[in-house]
From Swiss-Prot:
Entry's family note: Belongs to the fatty acid desaturase type 1 family.
Pathway: Lipid metabolism; polyunsaturated fatty acid biosynthesis
Protein name as it appears in the record: Delta(12) fatty acid desaturase
Organism: Mortierella isabellina (Filamentous fungus)
Example of a GO biological process term: unsaturated fatty acid biosynthetic process
Record bears the keyword RNA-binding: no
Top-level taxonomy: Eukaryota, Fungi, Fungi incertae sedis, Mucoromycota, Mucoromycotina
Motif annotated as Histidine box-1, chain positions: 112-116
Length: 400
């Protein structure tokens, strides 16, 4: 799907700018970029030991709270059509869709915690809770757990990362950088993007944010190019190994059970009823998931690495922390504003990640990336400016 952005700091962090650099010269942040040389040992040692402690009881309490909110919202929604005033109904349904989408995104995050085994010390509990919660949201739990683990193990790697893999110069149809025609065509491309009608950009943003998540699961959209059809539902997909066969079957059965329940409800009630109570909130979950992950891994100042320069900690730092506001940060269980810590130590439970981030900032300095830009500004900038990377080079940055 997308690429990285700009970052300027205070004393300890870079910070996003909105000034576009000429296509003929490298931006200052790219010219001055130096590879981080931290070891994973020194990064881990800067974080208090208790931040790595997991509590199944605490995890289950968060699940209970989120499921309670989802149930209360559902029950409240059953009263909406009883209002005689149509204006109240027209206002109440969107309010339900938005709030239920937010709550269910939080539930999705808790299932994601289970997949990382950060939910509790019990693998059985983690996988049981994760399978139930993700199946409810039409996510093949083990299938995505496996591909997501590979993403964490190879974040920022041009040929091994699993999602948000940037297209190269040749893949977008530009001539080699060294050719005389390249500068002219690149300039033409830049002008074309600048002049592209905002409504066109907005249209493609809506398509990506609403349908990008199921497209990734079904056909590996924005994922690594394996040269053949790839899907999270296919047991022999190149994402998986033969030993994953039964995990994929179990994942598919969970999604099929959820789809069966939705089809049954549609037959007993109506498709319109299922659409109002489930499908529209589900689309809002898709929106939040793609928005969150797009912004975490897409920014002009974040590098991508090839084999010669990549290592785990460098790749883990190729992500951006940002805030969606205290309410959403809380409802999304810190996945937005503590993502750097999560990528460095994915088995750290989310409720300790904020404290860990505090210590990481002090150690990482300018290599800790936080973007305070308004979300709308950040999305627009990344969507229009992060188009491709060069075909060659161990360290590459997004180009417009």
């Amino acid at each position: 799907m997308a690429p990285p952005n700009t970052i300027d700091a205070g004393l300890t962090q870079r910070h996003i700018t909105t000034t576009a650099a000429p296509t003929s010269a490298k931006p200052a942040f790219e010219r001055n970029y130096q590879l981080p040389e931290f070891t994973i040992k020194e990064i881990r040692e800067c974080i208090p030991a208790h931040c790595f402690e997991r509590s199944g009881l605490r995890g289950l309490c968060h699940v209970a709270i989120d499921l309670t909110w989802a149930s209360l919202l559902f029950l409240a929604a059953t009263q909406i059509d009883k209002f005689e005033n149509p204006l109240i109904r027209y206002l109440a349904w969107p309010a339900y869709w938005i709030m239920q989408g937010i709550v269910c995104t939080g539930i999705w995050v808790l299932a994601h915690e289970c997949g990382h085994q950060s939910f509790s010390t019990s693998k059985t509990l983690n996988n049981t809770v994760g399978w139930i919660l993700h199946s409810m949201l039409l996510v093949p739990y083990h299938s995505w757990r496996i591909s997501h683990s590979k993403h964490h193990k190879a974040t920022g790697h041009m040929t091994k990362d699993q999602v948000f893999v940037p297209k190269t110069r040749s893949q977008v149809g530009l001539p080699p950088k060294e050719s005389a025609a390249a500068a002219v065509q690149e300039e033409d491309m830049s002008v074309h993007l600048d002049e592209e009608a905002p409504i066109v950009t907005l249209f493609w943003m809506v398509i990506q944010f609403l349908f990008g998540w199921p497209a990734y699961l079904i056909m590996n959209a924005s994922g690594q190019d394996y040269g053949r059809w790839t899907s999270h539902f296919h047991t022999y997909s190149p994402i998986f190994e033969p030993r994953n066969f039964f995990d994929i079957i179990i994942s598919d059965l969970g999604v099929l059970a959820a789809l069966g329940a939705l089809i049954y409800a549609s037959m007993q009630l109506s498709l319109l009823t299922v659409t109002k109570y489930y499908i529209i909130p589900y689309l809002f979950v898709n929106f939040w998931l793609v928005l969150i992950t797009f912004l975490q891994h897409t920014d002009p100042k974040l590098p991508h690495y090839r084999e010669g320069a990549w290592n785990f900690q460098r790749g883990a730092l190729c992500t951006v922390d940002r805030s969606f506001g205290k309410f959403l940060d809380h409802m999304f269980h810190g996945i937005v504003h503590t993502h750097v810590a999560h990528h460095l130590f994915s088995q750290m439970p989310f409720y300790h990640a904020e404290e860990a981030t505090y210590h990481l900032k002090k150690l990482l300095g300018e290599y800790y990336v936080y973007d305070p830009s308004p979300i709308v500004v950040a999305v627009w900038r990344s969507f229009r400016e992060c188009r491709f990377v060069e075909d060659h080079g161990d360290v590459v940055f997004f180009k417009k």
